[in-house]
Amino acid sequence: MAGMKTASGDYIDSSWELRVFVGEEDPEAESVTLRVTGESHIGGVLLKIVEQINRKQDWSDHAIWWEQKRQWLLQTHWTLDKYGILADARLFFGPQHRPVILRLPNRRALRLRASFSQPLFQAVAAICRLLSIRHPEELSLLRAPEKKEKKKKEKEPEEELYDLSKVVLAGGVAPALFRGMPAHFSDSAQTEACYHMLSRPQPPPDPLLLQRLPRPSSLSDKTQLHSRWLDSSRCLMQQGIKAGDALWLRFKYYSFFDLDPKTDPVRLTQLYEQARWDLLLEEIDCTEEEMMVFAALQYHINKLSQSGEVGEPAGTDPGLDDLDVALSNLEVKLEGSAPTDVLDSLTTIPELKDHLRIFRIPRRPRKLTLKGYRQHWVVFKETTLSYYKSQDEAPGDPIQQLNLKGCEVVPDVNVSGQKFCIKLLVPSPEGMSEIYLRCQDEQQYARWMAGCRLASKGRTMADSSYTSEVQAILAFLSLQRTGSGGPGNHPHGPDASAEGLNPYGLVAPRFQRKFKAKQLTPRILEAHQNVAQLSLAEAQLRFIQAWQSLPDFGISYVMVRFKGSRKDEILGIANNRLIRIDLAVGDVVKTWRFSNMRQWNVNWDIRQVAIEFDEHINVAFSCVSASCRIVHEYIGGYIFLSTRERARGEELDEDLFLQLTGGHEAF
């Protein structure tokens, strides 16, 4: 037994004194001194600490933090010897959950208690459960950017700080609903206001404030954001986060699973807000026409949110809508089950044949050319695109045959100018071949664009998603078409008028510099006619879908240096591929699909990522702007997200995620 003494007062056993500070990491905190042995288990040490403090309170959330090893002692049955703790260990007895300031995707600030002892993946899952956000695996936390000291100190406007630090949820139990919201939000007027902030879109920002916010001016600037992601396999305490620190909550992985407006009001709204701010802060590029569509959708969403019309548009019966949807689904199933249709789909391979105008840019042009598009007869079958001089020559050898698997497909569209082009960056031994296809109209463009997108993923037009892809492209084009509403088309929602419309709060600053407000307002109102009948949830979904249609959507940028190269380049990470980008001009140099990846490894000693693809293709690079852990986690995270199944619901294989994203980096 620890602490046995002789008559003279000397200790005759192997016990020794262990000092433990009470509270968070503060050298001046009160401390207790315990008499322990190497065989003392952590649970017994915790009990002795509480007995010596002799203060009645709930200690259930407290645990011991070992400062030198940056480790929580959570295995209460382990002994001090098993942990390797000696008398010189600096130990702190403090709470595992501590307050942090969370900056949400909608830019609002929220105080809550987060776990400082669990891996970040679990801590984010608990935060999302508190905020009523499904599929927490899509989100993560970033460090807040360091504030630059200004020569002239400006008085920052006071912002409202919502507080959920006193809300505690029972573990493992899904929050019950009360009055249309999770029950823990209905406890007080403050928590109810917090839920409304989470689930309802925020008004447009002040245009002057928007112009002052930092924006990326180059690809290298865009890499800075992704250097701040926290490690999902380590706890907040291990990563130097302290109580009261500010963190950002963002959607990290651009692979959104089972997005349902009925069950996901908070998730849908926060995703819309992240997309909106991506556009306003120019973190993703879009054309002038596309910006007008996004501005019109924001204007419509803001009007509906302010008027309280959050449900279906007036004049509709939800019951009838549900019945119509059910009948429509039944009709589709009955039509799709016809034996002749099934037979045709099995015996015929879908293909596209049409006249298209083609312009091919050589990899290294010897001289400048003024030659433009030339009309060809183009045949698109499976994942192969072939073009001929004329239709009569089609049975023979083509001028060129391209396998689009693994290529980059970029839209180049101007609806008002009737320009419908598809830019293809096709991998070749010399690099990426650049080819443009020019279509005659929207219908032709939608069919060929959908086929190219599927082929780039290794799928054919026989895939069940081809028709929905065509429809999604046509829907996005229809939003950009002006004047389609007509004078007699009166929206069911709030009246569309210039009253209360400040266009500078709806468009990115580069468009503010290019156009005057009186030029933007009629264009936004004209685009609004195409979306005026959408409900709030439909408008948010349409905004997100349009955001997903942009060429640069879902690409996270990291500055790297490839093995054997003397210059820095950009590595783009998307949900299905890696993209090598020239830092100087922004051109895509090479693309590698995750589906062709055999394995990847990280050498933590030399900070290098090595990836092996099919056909004995090996790629290695070191990271410049961020830790190689971030690239490793992105790759593993996207592979994990691709394993999700609808049948499993929200059940997560946490061990698999940590296996795919965790590293063996020495802390």
Curated annotation (Swiss-Prot):
InterPro entries linked to this entry: Band_41_domain, FERM_2, FERM_central, Kindlin/fermitin, Kindlin_2_N, PH-like_dom_sf, PH_domain, PH_Kindlin/fermitin
Is the keyword Nucleotide-binding assigned to this protein?
no
**Tissue localization of expression:** Highly expressed in lymph node. Expressed in thymus, spleen and leukocytes. Weakly expressed in placenta, small intestine, stomach, testis and lung. Overexpressed in B-cell malignancies.
| Annotated consequence of substituting residue 599 to S | In LAD3; uncertain significance; decreases cell adhesion in hematopoietic cells; requires 2 nucleotide substitutions
Give residue ranges for domain PH.
354-457
Location(s), subcellular: Cell projection, Podosome
Q: Name one Pfam family in it.
A: Kindlin_2_N
Q: Which GO terms describe its cellular component?
A: cell projection; cell-substrate junction; extracellular exosome; extracellular region; membrane; platelet alpha granule lumen; podosome
Q: Which residues carry this modification: Phosphoserine?
A: 8
Q: Write down which residues bear the modification named Phosphothreonine.
A: 591
Span of domain FERM: 229-558
Kindly give the SMART domains that the UniProt entry links to this protein: B41, PH
Which Gene3D superfamilies has this protein been placed in? Phosphatidylinositol 3-kinase Catalytic Subunit, Chain A, domain 1, Pleckstrin-homology domain (PH domain)/Phosphotyrosine-binding domain (PTB)
The UniProt entry, under PROSITE patterns, shows: FERM_2, PH_DOMAIN
Principal location: other
Q: Which residues are modified to Phosphotyrosine?
A: 11, 504
The protein's UniProt keywords, in alphabetical order, are: Cell adhesion, Cell junction, Cell projection, Disease variant, Phosphoprotein
Key word Phosphoprotein present: yes
- Read off the PANTHER family from this record: FERMITIN 2-RELATED (PTHR16160), FERMITIN FAMILY HOMOLOG 3 (PTHR16160:SF1)
> Which proteins does it associate with, and in what oligomeric form?
Interacts with ITGB1, ITGB2 and ITGB3 (via cytoplasmic tails).
The record's domain comment reads:
The FERM domain is not correctly detected by PROSITE or Pfam techniques because it contains the insertion of a PH domain.
UniProt disease link: Leukocyte adhesion deficiency 3: A disorder characterized by recurrent bacterial infections without pus formation, leukocytosis and major bleeding disorders.
- Describe its function: Plays a central role in cell adhesion in hematopoietic cells. Acts by activating the integrin beta-1-3 (ITGB1, ITGB2 and ITGB3). Required for integrin-mediated platelet adhesion and leukocyte adhesion to endothelial cells. Required for activation of integrin beta-2 (ITGB2) in polymorphonuclear granulocytes (PMNs).
Q: What is this protein called?
A: Fermitin family homolog 3
Q: Give the species this sequence originates from.
A: Homo sapiens
